C-alpha cells in the first residue's frame, strides 16, 4: 500500500512535563487471523514520533504509543500512516499516569469520553420530523428530497462529511442502472437530477439546501434506537468529530445506511451475505 498523508490537529495540554500517550485501535484483519497487521501507524507530538507502532491488537483496546515531554499548552498531534491499508484510530489519550486503567467496555467508555469532552450525559433534543432518513447516499438523497417536495418535514442524517455514499467524492462509484421503468415510471426522477454526486457535489448540496423543510446533518452517525413496542420512536446520532449526540424523533424512518444499520439497531431480522 501507499501511506496516506499525515492527519494532524492541535490540542491543549494543561501541564508541562512527561505525558504518556495511548491510542484506542486494533488490527482490523485479526478476525481472519492475519499475522501482520495491515493498518499500522504511529503518533507524533510536536513533530517527535513516539516509539511504538499501533494497530496491532486483536480487539478494540488502548495501545501504548509512548511518552513525550510537553513544554507548552498548545501542541500538535499527528497520525502517521505506515502501510496505506486503512489503519483504525478511535481516540488518543494523554495521561500523567502510565499505568492508568482506561475504560474499554462500551458503557464505561461512553461515560468516560463524555466526562473528558464535557458532553452532556443526555443527547440534545433534535426535534420531531415527519420523516427521518438515515444515510445520504443516492437512496437517502432521493428519499429525503422527494419527501421534502411532498411537504414533509425531513431530517437527513449522514455519517460522512459529504453526501453521496459510494457515489460521493470520497469513493466515486459510478451510478448506473435502469430508471423510470414500468410500472413505477416516476422511480428515478430524483436520481436523474442528481446523476453522479462526485461530479457535482456543490450542486447536490445546493439541492438539499433549497428544500426548505429538509434539514441536513452531516458527520452524524446513528448508533442507537428507542422504540415503543415494535415502533421506532427515535434515533440517536453521534457527531463523528466532536462526539456531540442528538436524538431525532419521528413516526417514519428510512434505512439508507447502506449496511442495514438502522434495521439492525431496531431489532429487525437480517441476514449477512452477497447477492
Pin down the residues of each PLM region.
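Extracytoplasmic
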Residues: 1-123
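Beta1/beta-strand and adjacent pyrophosphate-binding region of the FAD-binding site
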Residues: 125-137
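Core beta-strand elements of the Rossmann-like FAD/NAD(P) dinucleotide-binding domain
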Residues: 127-129, 243-252
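N-terminal Rossmann-fold NAD(P) dinucleotide-binding loop
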Residues: 140
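Aromatic pocket-lining residues of Rossmann-like dinucleotide-binding sites
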Residues: 147
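Conserved N-terminal/central alpha/beta ligand/cofactor-binding core
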Residues: 152-153, 158-231, 237, 271
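Glycine-rich loop(s) and the adjacent beta-strand/alpha-helix scaffold that form part
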Residues: 255-275
Amino acid at each position: 500500500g501507499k501511506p496516506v498523508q499525515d492527519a494532524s490537529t492541535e490540542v491543549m495540554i494543561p501541564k508541562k512535563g512527561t505525558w504518556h500517550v495511548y491510542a484506542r485501535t486494533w488490527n482490523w484483519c485479526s478476525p481472519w487471523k492475519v499475522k501482520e497487521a495491515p493498518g499500522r501507524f504511529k503518533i507524533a507530538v510536536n513533530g517527535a514520533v513516539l516509539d511504538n507502532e499501533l494497530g496491532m491488537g486483536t480487539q478494540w483496546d488502548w495501545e501504548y504509543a509512548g511518552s513525550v515531554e510537553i513544554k507548552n499548552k498548545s501542541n500538535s498531534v499527528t497520525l502517521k500512516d505506515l502501510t496505506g491499508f486503512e489503519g483504525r484510530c478511535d481516540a488518543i489519550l494523554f495521561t500523567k499516569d502510565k499505568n492508568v486503567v482506561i475504560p474499554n467496555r462500551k458503557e464505561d467508555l461512553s461515560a468516560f469520553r463524555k466526562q473528558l469532552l464535557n458532553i452532556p450525559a443526555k443527547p440534545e433534543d433534535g426535534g420531531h420530523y415527519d420523516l427521518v432518513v438515515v444515510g445520504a447516499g443516492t437512496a437517502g438523497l432521493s428519499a429525503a428530497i422527494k419527501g421534502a417536495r411532498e411537504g414533509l418535514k425531513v431530517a437527513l442524517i449522514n455519517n460522512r462529511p459529504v453526501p453521496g455514499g459510494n457515489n460521493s467524492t470520497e469513493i466515486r462509484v459510478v451510478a448506473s442502472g435502469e430508471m423510470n421503468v414500468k410500472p413505477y415510471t416516476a422511480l428515478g426522477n430524483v436520481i436523474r437530477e442528481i446523476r453522479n454526486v462526485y461530479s457535482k457535489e456543490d450542486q447536490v448540496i445546493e439541492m438539499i439546501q433549497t428544500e426548505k423543510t429538509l434539514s441536513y446533518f452531516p458527520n452524524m452517525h446513528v448508533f442507537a434506537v428507542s422504540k415503543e413496542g415494535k415502533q421506532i420512536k427515535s434515533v440517536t446520532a453521534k457527531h463523528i468529530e466532536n462526539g456531540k449526540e442528538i436524538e431525532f424523533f419521528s413516526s417514519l424512518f428510512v434505512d439508507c445506511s447502506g449496511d442495514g444499520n438502522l434495521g439492525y439497531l431496531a431489532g429487525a431480522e437480517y441476514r449477512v451475505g452477497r447477492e
